[in-house]
Amino acid sequence: MEKLEQIKLDICARIEKYDTQENTINKKFVNETNTIKELFEYIFAFGNEEVIMSNIISDRLKAQVITIDKLEEWFGENFLTKHNVYYYGKHIVYGGFKNVIVLGCAQIEVGSDALVYSFQNSTVNLTQKSTLYANDNSVFYANHYSNVYVMEYSSVKGQTFNYSHCTNNSNNAFINAFDNSEIDLYYRARVISHGNSIIRAYNDSIVLTSNVGNCCISLQHNAICYCNNPSAHIICENKSTAIIDFNNSIDKIKVTGIIEAKHNSLIKLYSDVRTMKVRDNAVVLDYTDTHCHPFDDTFILWMNKMQAWYNTKQSGDELTFIQD
């Protein structure tokens, strides 16, 4: 009964949040229902309240208050499909549906600005500016300006293409970024950058790059990048770390991109870099023993010859050379 009462409170709060002139759900009727099934039946009757319904089901699935078996027992497959709830099989859903729920092992392709919630082991192919909230062990493929939000504590796996965007909030999720897509990483999340992707990493997140494309990577707040891409543009700030040519291969790559470090960040170089900007207490560990132009209170350490370049003056002033 406590679960039912909490759901009623959530629904009433959403009714107030999304209240419009077309709103037909009555909070009095919501509060008079006696079971979760009866409550869902009442709300399902109003197709124009999809936002409220989808959020409520999503919340209860995440909290394991309801299950696939319960939904099937209460409503049946035909009823659920009619309301864009899928729990097995393959489906193609277009036409501007704003709320789709994918459960179990269902596979679905959606487009036309759809809003999708995925759970369990489902698979979602997003196109045409659709939006996905990915949970549990679901899999996604995002295309054509779609947006994906990987929810906390999930183990989602996904790929982004064609100007799509993903925000990853889970350290158990793993994303591959392709073809001009953009990724935001938080809380120890991980991504592999392919092609011309743009990555913004925060809060101990990890970025790995392939050796193709012209990726742009921004690291903040202890984020780490392992870079094997000679054309990468990497910006390190706020105690972040970039490791260039992390596999330390025999055939060293020539980095033609730009490496920037500032705000107590760390760069480890195993390859020669054409353009490097180091300032604001950043440190470079140079295993090639070639770079010697630090700026503004920064260190460049030659790791083989055990020499250090250090500048305590302003950019452009004479450098100080320290030899151990």
What do these predicted regions represent?
Residues M1-D324:
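Short, glycine-biased loop/turn motifs at secondary-structure junctions and
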